[in-house]
Regions:
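Bacterial Sec-dependent N-terminal signal peptides
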Residues: 2-27, 54, 84-104, 175-209, ...
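Juxtadomain low-complexity/linker regions and immediately adjacent membrane-anchoring helices
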Residues: 190-234, 275-286, 328-399, 800
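Aromatic, loop-rich ligand-recognition surfaces of beta-strand-rich domains
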Residues: 234-299, 308-362
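Beta/coil-rich, acidic/histidine-enriched accessory regions frequently appended to metallopeptidases
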Residues: 355, 361-397, 771-859
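Active-site-proximal alpha-helical
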Residues: 692-804, 808, 813
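Beta-strand-enriched, solvent-exposed domains that form extended recognition/catalytic surfaces
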Residues: 358-519
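Surface-exposed binding patches on compact interaction domains or structured appendages
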Residues: 34-63, 102-103, 123-152
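Catalytic cores of extracellular degradative/oxidative enzymes
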Residues: 530-533, 540-738
């Protein structure tokens, strides 16, 4: 029967399970050994698959007892330890009466700088070890003949570029009367030592992480059932504390959260982890207090968390001795007044046993040795991780590219999202070129942060049937940061400012002393290195960065579709992003986005756009990762999705326009920038209509329908590409005919740049969708400096309507005769003349005629 043990802790965290040894060897006599089991589970069990091997639980120890063996050969059993769904096994071996040698660990991998290796040998014969010449015996801790003996050997530092293999062979010493037929038993320990040609970081186990202080309990002045404060210190980052969903009361804020530590402690900092599955409740303005006795509280800090999605470390100016911490949440993200939520709140004391960088390195980033350091100095270092790092450096074998970098600050993209009324651009402008594995220790050495919050995001795009965009954030502080990575992925530095221009946000030097170099390609600094960097990539995904765009696609897709022309690929995406910004008027009005447009591969849906990124199914890569196709037939998709991000709300995106006005950008990129045929001109429409122009003319102008509600032959009523026609006609006439477009104006201005600038500056508060549609007409007249009422009337913008429109959301679009009369009065009051051409008939095939002013006849 399995044995069970229970923890005395009331709170269950995410289960952990560690066993001090995974192989246990016994002599043939009945005996027992004890192993330490480390777990935070409430209960754990142990069970053996053999009756001669019996596990028993004594507190936190697992005692394994074996019966005497009368068998000839070594026998084996497996003990399974299970804790809260986690399971690990222990291999149990026992000698028989025939000669045998058992070694509990028979393979070691050591760094180039050398290391000590330890293992136990259990045998019933006298043995003699034979060593490779670069492995030497260290002082024994104990020795006992023909039972279990602990051995310790030192592996000398290597000066070789490549790995080397060595062995320690234990061979039975035969008695003097042995005959030639007696064959000695033997067992081998293999030792692999890394060479100097490729840096291999130590595991970092010797680096002492800061001490996480246990929270005993807590209280909240407001909470939603199922979202109690206990969810914010249960060790599970997927569960959250959440304030009451009813936030309508005038006294909803402030909300007070109190955390009580298990004991009074010296506390150096805390970490706030916001929820990862939404925005509601992410902290904004918070007052933090502390108390040594749990009753009298002292103000500690005022912190604006800005509703950030990143984990935030709050470092105290000096350690505080505290039993309790109180958070007075004054504002939080979310609808209405907002809410308060927290995935985890953690409190830490710095570890006094931390490595002193000044013994070997020039600064806290440990990116170069201090002047005068010798190999003898390095040999004295008692921290294997830093000893190994220093050894590579002194041998001139440490490659700093992608491991050491200066990372600049970027404005939070939410800033320009607010001023430009668009989706926010990228949060991932600082790729590192480092990839990490789940559960590995990532050692990050950080220089002066200049008082700013810096964090890492690990993004794992390998999400079958999903989109892995996002990831886990890890706050950083100056000095040594030891991070235990929860999920594999690529690493990005998150360094964002609250304002567009912040002179104090100087670059931060960061050293990734572990993790794997995957690299990335930046067209602005890696000219001519595409083949080299892509060839060296080790991860499934690879970052390609341009001046205006940044994409993360599968490495193999780059190799397959852009093997020798990745620079052209990112230049094309830069062109799309840049030219859409120019058509928005952002260059003309000195409002260019400071963040890049981000594109990532995903495995659900087809393509889509949302906050901070656009996403593309892996099945589209043969088109959008191929420069030859991207600049011809495949440009529409990315231009369309990026166009969604750039839609100016609400002035150029009222109800019904979500899949319409973004395609102003698609048409512009397809025709004006890449010189391809226009989709609405050339796309095959079957037997009834020649093209979208014909279909739109018949469905709206001839029928006298509202632009928002028209019908055509067939099942595709309210075709969004038909709705696009008048918007594109405006660019054809004012842009291609009159030259009022960014490519033809030296200031990068034009008709649409002015339209978008008006929409950015206009306050639409209190306006209905019908008001906004009519205001767009006014905007166009103002920007064109022409009276365009006839044009918009023919295209149904002035046609009365009162109908619910489904467009991701459902709202009623109302345009009344009185509203139209008011618009006419307002536009006519501008005093502009009407166009002297039949503007409603211009098309991609006919705009040249408008240049020559040939007569256009309706029909």
């Amino acid at each position: 029967m399995p044995l069970a043990a229970c923890s005395s802790d009331d709170e269950i965290a995410i289960a952990t399970l560690e066993i001090s040894k995974t192989t246990v060897d016994f002599k043939s006599e009945a005996s027992e050994q004890s192993l330490t089991i480390t777990t935070n589970a409430v209960a754990w069990t142990a069970q053996s698959d053999k009756s001669w091997c019996r596990p028993s639980i004594v507190g936190k120890l697992l005692k394994i007892s074996v019966d005497q063996s009368d068998e000839r050969l070594v026998r084996e059993a497996t003990v399974s330890v299970t804790a809260d769904g986690l399971s690990k096994t222990i291999r149990v071996r026992q000698l028989g009466y025939e000669a045998a040698i058992l070694i509990d660990q028979q393979a070691f991998e050591v760094p180039a700088v050398g290391a000590q290796i330890k293992f136990a040998v259990t045998t019933n014969v006298e043995v003699e070890p034979i060593l490779s010449d670069w492995i030497v015996e260290a002082p024994k801790t104990r020795s006992a003949e023909m039972v279990t003996t602990d051995y310790c050997y030192s592996v000398r530092a290597s000066i070789l570029d490549n790995k080397r293999q060595g062995t320690i062979v234990f061979t039975e010493k035969l008695p003097e009367d042995a005959t030639e037929n007696d064959v000695p038993v033997s067992a081998t320990v293999s030792v692999t030592q890394h060479g100097l040609n490729e840096y291999n970081a130590d595991t970092g186990e010797d680096i002492k992480g800061d001490i996480k202080l246990k929270v005993k309990d807590g209280t909240a002045s407001s909470f939603q059932g199922g979202g109690e404060i206990e969810k914010s210190f249960d060790g599970d980052y997927s569960t959250i504390y959440h304030s009451s969903w009813n936030n309508s009361g005038s006294n909803y804020f402030p909300i007070t959260l109190t955390y009580n530590l298990e004991e009074v402690s010296d506390v150096d900092y805390l970490v706030y982890y916001p929820r990862t599955d939404g925005a509601n409740g992410k902290f904004k303005e918070v007052e933090i207090q502390y108390s040594e006795d749990g009753s009298a509280f002292t103000p500690l800090a005022d912190k604006d968390f800005l509703g950030s999605a990143s984990a935030t470390k709050v470092l105290f100016d000096a350690p505080v001795r505290a039993k309790s911490f109180r958070f007075i949440v004054k504002t939080g993200a979310g609808d209405g007044q907002g809410f308060a939520s927290c995935a985890e709140m953690e409190f830490y004391a710095k570890n006094p046993e931390a490595f002193d960088y000044s013994t070997l390195f020039a600064d806290e980033t440990c990116s170069e040795l201090k002047a005068g350091i010798t190999e003898a100095d390095i040999e004295k270092c008692e921290f294997p991780f830093f000893k190994n790092l220093a050894y590579y450096m002194i041998k001139g074998k440490y490659e700093p590219e992608f491991r050491v970098g200066e990372f600049k600050a970027y404005p939070n993209p939410d800033i320009q999202s607010g001023t430009h009324k668009t989706n926010p651009y990228s949060l991932l402008d600082n790729p590192t070129g480092i990839s990490v594995k789940a559960n590995e220790n990532l050692i990050v050495l950080v220089g002066d942060t200049h008082g700013y919050d810096i964090s890492l995001k690990v993004q794992n795009l390998d999400a079958p049937e999903s989109d892995g965009f996002g990831g886990v954030t890890y706050p950083l502080s100056r000095g040594t940061n030891k991070l235990t990575i929860s999920e594999k992925g690529l690493v990005y530095v998150m360094y964002h400012t609250r304002t567009l221009d912040d002179a104090a946000a100087l670059p931060v030097k960061i050293h990734f002393a572990s993790g794997t170099v995957n690299g990335y390609f930046d067209s602005q600094k890696h000219e001519g290195r595409w083949n080299e960097l892509l060839g060296k990539a080790t991860d499934k995904y690879f970052d390609v960065v341009g001046k205006y765009a940044h994409m993360t696609f599968e490495t193999n897709d780059y190799r397959k579709y852009a093997a020798n022309n990745g620079n052209e690929l990112i230049d094309l995406y830069d062109q799309i992003a840049l030219n859409e910004m120019q058509l928005l008027g952002l260059e003309k009005y000195d409002k260019m986005f400071r963040n890049r447009m981000y594109l990532n591969v995903m495995y659900q849906s087809y393509m889509y756009a949302t906050s901070y990124h656009t996403a593309y199914n892996q099945t589209t890569m043969s088109d959008i990762c191929n420069p030859s196709k991207l600049k011809t037939s495949a440009c529409w998709g990315p231009a369309h999705e990026i166009g969604h991000c750039n839609q100016t709300r609400l002035g150029v995106m009222w109800i019904g326009m979500t899949e319409v006005t973004n395609n102003i950008m698609s048409e512009y990129i397809q025709t004006t920038i890449f010189g391809q045929g226009s989709r609405i001109q050339t796309e095959d429409m079957g037997d009834v209509y020649r093209n979208r122009y014909s279909k739109a003319w018949n469905g709206i102008i001839v029928a006298g329908s509202s632009h928002a509600d028209f019908s055509n032959i067939g099942d595709d009523a309210n075709d969004v590409f038909c709705k696009l026609v008048p918007f594109w006609q405006l660019e054809l006439y004012f842009g291609k005919v009159l030259g009022r477009t960014p490519l033809q104006q030296s200031d990068k201005g034009g008709f649409y740049p002015d339209v978008y600038e008006y929409a950015r500056n206009k306050d639409y508060t209190g306006m209905t969708d019908g008001d906004i549609q009519l205001d767009f007409v006014y905007n166009c007249c103002l920007s064109a400096k022409m009276n365009l009422l006839d044009f918009f009337e023919k295209w149904g913008f002035l046609t009365p309507i009162n109908k619910k429109i489904e467009d991701y959301d459902t709202r009623t679009l109302t345009v009344t005769p009185d509203m139209v009369d008011a618009l006419r009065h307002k536009v006519n009051g501008l005093g502009y003349s009407k166009p002297d051409v039949a503007l409603e008939y211009i098309s991609d095939n006919s705009f040249e005629l408008y240049k020559s002013r040939a007569s256009v006849v309706a029909g």
